[in-house]
Amino acid sequence: MRQTARFPTRWTAISSALVVLLCVLALILVPIPFVARSPGQTVNLLSTNERGKPMIQVDGLTTRHGEGEMRMTTVSITRADSRLSMAEALVAHLRADHDVLQREAIYPPGRSPQQVDADESYMMDTSERDAAVAALRAAGQPVTEMPMVSAVSAAGPAHGKLAPGDLIEKVDGKPVASVLDVGKAVRKHTVGDTVVFVVLRNSSVKTIAVTTVSSVSDRRAPAVGVTIDTGYRYTPTITYNIPGDIVGPSAGLAMALSIYQMVAPNDLIGSLRIAGTGGISPDGNVVAIGGIQEKIAVAERDGAKIFLVPAGNCRDISGVETSMRLVKVSSLKDAIAAIQKIRAGGTGIPHC
């Protein structure tokens, strides 16, 4: 009877061990619909990269860099082509400087990893352009708005002819100054007509003829298969040599301040060690971003003494402990004024 009683006990033990093993494997291997976000890195935009090239290079104007630092801040986040396990999520949740977020809050449902990468690269390109425009305007440099090709349909008649970034000067020999002007000029044609564009591409003027086809939304309306947005023309050439794995829109403010520091009549930053975050529009408005607490942590880790916080993010940092001075900014103009006051020992500087 003792022998027959041992078999259920043995099998119960084995079954329990298997259940525990399966639970452990599930904890380690089964992906869950969350991502982890943690402090990333900072990059001093007034320095050079690992190849010795300036992070931001401005040609065509006299420039300065100074002794100070203007650091952009980043977060590290689970990649779009990777999945977070429950164990990894638990570890991240227990760490004070990490966040665990719903995956769809970061990566739109239905978008492939390749599409997400393309979206983020496009946002970085747009942020670089808008930062340049905002900085040059703030420094008193002339900037002209022009209609610009922002996308070309691979199936449209302009494919291989017009290119994203082309600034449109004329349509059918007549100057155009806005997106609306280009649309009106194309709509004057009938389907099958040829539209002649004069565009500025990489400082070269090109004349390009495109035959219209039927619009997808109205078969009787002519179309050339491009998306037109507002672009900008200015004298200097601005080149970004920021590490290629940094993408997204949130470095706009830091890039704009760095360009302003280089081209403005007077030294803005001096020897200050500044970090910051925030998207920026061409007219200089600062936009709130995600991951503000992680960015504050990484900025302090890398030695920043002042951190520029978008006004829209102040509510996200209540309770954050830091030795840095947190300065609230709503615009590039605000940021410039605050830095000038700090250097002058002034008071009344906005803070979160």
Feature map (PLM): residue ranges:
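Hydrophobic membrane-insertion alpha-helices, especially the h-region
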Residues: 11-31
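Terminal peptide-recognition signature
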Residues: 136, 158, 165-168, 197, ...
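PDZ/PDZ-like peptide-tail recognition elements
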Residues: 39-64, 73-80, 100-153, 215-236, ...
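PDZ-domain C-terminal substructure recognizer with occasional recognition of PDZ-binding tails
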Residues: 184-228, 318-344, 348-352
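Glycine- and Gly-Pro-enriched alpha-helical subdomains that act as flexible
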Residues: 262-264, 274, 282-307
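Short, glycine/polar-rich helix-capping loops at beta-to-alpha or helix-loop-helix junctions
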Residues: 308-319
